[in-house]
């Protein structure tokens, strides 16, 4: 395999998730032979990638959400790579944003970081792990409230 243009496009985790899910469905429908070594390697990589990505916030995203997020990000002066990191990781704290935005101390004020955090958390849906941790903490809080 030869890389013609390494910087042709940046893909979000959501786009990779959709691409691999569609590829998996096409293979199921066509009933392709899975006996070749190359095909087995591709199946293993596809499986592991889908397994990982399905635990991230991108699993709950849609094209409309991605478009809304990118439109909202226009007011923030961020690079494409920084926007992509925010989209892929859905930071929930100011520290996470500071780690994703290069030279954030010089480029962003605390108010801008808070506005960015609000934009990210209000537009992008929570990931499966975030939802599980919320339900676990809610269950623990309910157990504490119940008289023993």
Swiss-Prot record:
Keywords: Antiviral defense, Cell membrane, DNA-directed RNA polymerase, Immunity, Innate immunity, Membrane, Nucleus, Transcription. It is found in: Nucleus; Cell membrane. Residues 124-148 are annotated as: Disordered. Its main location: nucleus. Signal peptide: none annotated. It holds the Pfam family RNA_pol_Rpb4. One of its GO terms (molecular function) is nucleotide binding. GO terms for cellular component: acrosomal vesicle; axon; dendrite; DNA polymerase III complex; neuronal cell body; plasma membrane; RNA polymerase III complex. InterPro entries: HRDC-like_sf, RNA_pol_Rpb4/RPC9_core, Rpb4/RPC9, Rpb4/RPC9_sf, RPC9. It is a peripheral membrane protein. GO terms for biological process: defense response to virus; innate immune response; neuropeptide signaling pathway; transcription by RNA polymerase III; transcription initiation at RNA polymerase III promoter. Coiled coil: none annotated. DNA-dependent RNA polymerase catalyzes the transcription of DNA into RNA using the four ribonucleoside triphosphates as substrates. Specific peripheric component of RNA polymerase III (Pol III) which synthesizes small non-coding RNAs including 5S rRNA, snRNAs, tRNAs and miRNAs from at least 500 distinct genomic loci. With POLR3H/RPC8 forms a mobile stalk that protrudes from Pol III core and functions primarily in transcription initiation. Pol III plays a key role in sensing and limiting infection by intracellular bacteria and DNA viruses. Belongs to the eukaryotic RPC9 RNA polymerase subunit family. Component of the RNA polymerase III complex consisting of 17 subunits: a ten-subunit horseshoe-shaped catalytic core composed of POLR3A/RPC1, POLR3B/RPC2, POLR1C/RPAC1, POLR1D/RPAC2, POLR3K/RPC10, POLR2E/RPABC1, POLR2F/RPABC2, POLR2H/RPABC3, POLR2K/RPABC4 and POLR2L/RPABC5; a mobile stalk composed of two subunits POLR3H/RPC8 and CRCP/RPC9, protruding from the core and functioning primarily in transcription initiation; and additional subunits homologous to general transcription factors of the RNA polymerase II machinery, POLR3C/RPC3-POLR3F/RPC6-POLR3G/RPC7 heterotrimer required for transcription initiation and POLR3D/RPC4-POLR3E/RPC5 heterodimer involved in both transcription initiation and termination. This is DNA-directed RNA polymerase III subunit RPC9. It comes from Rattus norvegicus.
């Amino acid at each position: 395999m030869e890389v013609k243009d390494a910087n042709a496009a940046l893909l979000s985790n959501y786009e990779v998730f959709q691409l691999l899910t569609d590829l998996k469905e096409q293979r199921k429908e066509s009933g392709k032979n899975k006996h070749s070594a190359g095909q087995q390697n591709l199946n293993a990589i596809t499986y592991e990638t889908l397994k990982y990505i399905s635990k991230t916030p991108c699993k709950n995203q849609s094209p409309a959400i991605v478009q809304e997020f990118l439109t909202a990000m226009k007011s923030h002066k961020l690079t494409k790579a920084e926007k992509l990191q925010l989209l892929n990781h859905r930071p929930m704290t100011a520290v996470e944003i500071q780690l994703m935005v290069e030279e954030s101390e010089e480029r962003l004020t605390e108010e801008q970081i808070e506005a960015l955090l609000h934009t990210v958390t209000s537009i992008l849906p929570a990931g499966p792990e975030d939802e599980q941790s919320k339900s676990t903490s809610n269950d623990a809080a309910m157990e504490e409230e119940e008289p023993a």
